[in-house]
């Protein structure tokens, strides 16, 4: 897709994306609403296909996007790392090639990727209380939003 300081960003097929999400362990939890710790690879690949998700790898980071069915120029995005450089390149790709004008990230509270989203111009706009069950308890999911202009100026 593009070159970043983290190396090439390359698209993964659903089976490879499922395997890489499983290998990401806890940093992959909540990635586009999925849980690679409790879902097997076949189910993950089927869900990624059903959602028409695009999953990419940039170094050790996984990046994902799903078009919002109610707003075709808006993408739900996910990342597994705090590094903003690959995320910024990915958002630029989505804006330029797929004409996305805004982005929404639903991130488990306390996830490492929060730092990347904030450094790329995302703003916290809300939270879903007790939205996700993990490790014997419910956890909040934080909602972030950014327009294309926000991510390009960061």
Which stretches of residues belong to each language-model region?
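Acetyl-CoA-dependent GNAT
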Residues: 29-87, 93-94
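A short, well-structured alpha-helix characteristic of acyl/acetyltransferase catalytic modules
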Residues: 1-50, 150-154
């Amino acid at each position: 897709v593009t070159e970043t300081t983290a190396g090439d960003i390359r698209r993964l097929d659903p089976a490879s994306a499922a395997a890489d999400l499983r290998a990401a362990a806890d940093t992959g939890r909540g990635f586009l609403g999925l849980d690679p710790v409790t879902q097997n690879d076949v189910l993950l690949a089927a869900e990624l296909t059903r959602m028409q998700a695009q999953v990419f790898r940039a170094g050790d980071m996984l990046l994902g996007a799903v078009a919002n069915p109610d707003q075709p120029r808006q993408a739900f995005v996910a990342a597994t790392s705090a590094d903003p450089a690959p995320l910024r390149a990915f958002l630029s790709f989505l804006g330029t090639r797929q004409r996305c004008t805004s982005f929404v990230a639903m991130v488990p509270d306390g996830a490492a990727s929060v730092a990347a989203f904030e450094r790329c111009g995302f703003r916290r706009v809300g939270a879903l209380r007790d939205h996700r069950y993990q490790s014997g308890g419910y956890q909040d999911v934080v909602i972030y939003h950014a327009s294309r202009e926000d991510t390009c100026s960061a």
